[in-house]
Amino acid sequence: MTVNLGMPTPPIPTLAPRRKTHQIKVGDVLVGGDAPISVQSMTTTKTHDVGATLQQIAALTAAGCDIVRVACPTDKDAEVLPIIAKRSQIPVIADIHFQPKYVFQAIEAGCGAVRVNPGNIRKFDDQIESICQAATEHGTSIRIGVNAGSLDKRLLDKYGAPTAEAMVESALWEASLFEQYGFRDFKISVKHHDPVVMIRAYEQLAAKCDYPLHLGVTEAGPAFQGTIKSAVAFGHLLAEGIGDTIRVSLSADPVEEVKVGIKILESLNLRPRGLEIVSCPSCGRCQVDVLTLANDVTDALEGIDAPLRVAVMGCVVNGLGEGREADLGVAAGNGKGKIFKHGEVIRTVPEGEIVQFLVQEANRMADEMDTTGAVEVTVS
């Protein structure tokens, strides 16, 4: 029963429309325009260790990564790019610093894109025309990757620090060099370790060009700190419609970068939701170890890809109500758990059987969603 309190119904919050951007291709992945926002990561292996690099790319792909970047600091790394690009399941971006010759090798190797840093590639500007020709011939896109830690000295002298304005000027100057040869297949990033400066830089850049933007907070830090910085910065910009591809930079396993990136997009309804675990923060009313139970449920359901929301609640006081919007859940207490679907209790099980029963029901619901797109609630 719905009680009318005489209060106006607030509108459902929505994000700003996506910024209209020029669309490019990174391998077979569309970036910009009306393409979905892609999630990127970067390998941590020595690229010339082909086996280790491809193994990590496979793990990233399995986690949902759309595009992967590999470092190319040496001749040995450049020489194996054809193998990496050919065997990778997802498009490869070669990350080039200091040596323009590696740009050409990466293009010829079949990389989906090449990242260049205008702050540190010596004698780069006078080779732009040749790079444009090679990139056009091979269908390779470019990422102009400006980084606060390697900004051109001239801009540091002008602005006194790697400000948002300095990074934007660097990016637009580099873009103009490509534009003079009619080349527009590039995306831009202006990364800073401070989310506030980073946000300001992307907002300024978005107002001055229509190129797709790659979002990133550089040197974000360990997993906990980096996740917060990236979520704050990306959430702000994506809510404004700014951003076409993202990379969460963490001092952690790159697979964690992908997981965080996907969850950020899912949280903003910018990517179809997969499995979601919601759980209460625990309090003095709890009669079960919510932290352990939530972690056990999360681990047990890890292989399920269906868009299920599963709630783990620590008591029956608010558990059923708070978990009503979940597809499946449990409100635990007094050594047992009330299992519910869409707010309706379907079974009460002993505490020791909660995880097993949730896994069983979640798998059944996932199977039904695969075949019918809907699930049936059965009470027993």
UniProtKB/Swiss-Prot annotation:
Pfam families: GcpE. Its cofactor is [4Fe-4S] cluster. Its EC number is 1.17.7.3. InterPro entries: Dihydropteroate_synth-like_sf, IspG_bac, IspG_bac-typ, NO2/SO3_Rdtase_4Fe4S_sf. GO terms for biological process: isopentenyl diphosphate biosynthetic process, methylerythritol 4-phosphate pathway; terpenoid biosynthetic process. Pathway: Isoprenoid biosynthesis; isopentenyl diphosphate biosynthesis via DXP pathway; isopentenyl diphosphate from 1-deoxy-D-xylulose 5-phosphate: step 5/6. GO terms for molecular function: 4 iron, 4 sulfur cluster binding; 4-hydroxy-3-methylbut-2-en-1-yl diphosphate synthase activity (ferredoxin); 4-hydroxy-3-methylbut-2-enyl-diphosphate synthase activity (flavodoxin); iron ion binding. Signal peptide: none annotated. The keyword DNA damage does not apply. It is an enzyme of class 1 (oxidoreductase). Binds 1 [4Fe-4S] cluster. [4Fe-4S] cluster binds at C280, C283, C315, E322. The keyword Transmembrane does not apply. Converts 2C-methyl-D-erythritol 2,4-cyclodiphosphate (ME-2,4cPP) into 1-hydroxy-2-methyl-2-(E)-butenyl 4-diphosphate. This is 4-hydroxy-3-methylbut-2-en-1-yl diphosphate synthase (flavodoxin). It comes from Cutibacterium acnes (strain DSM 16379 / KPA171202) (Propionibacterium acnes). The gene is ispG.
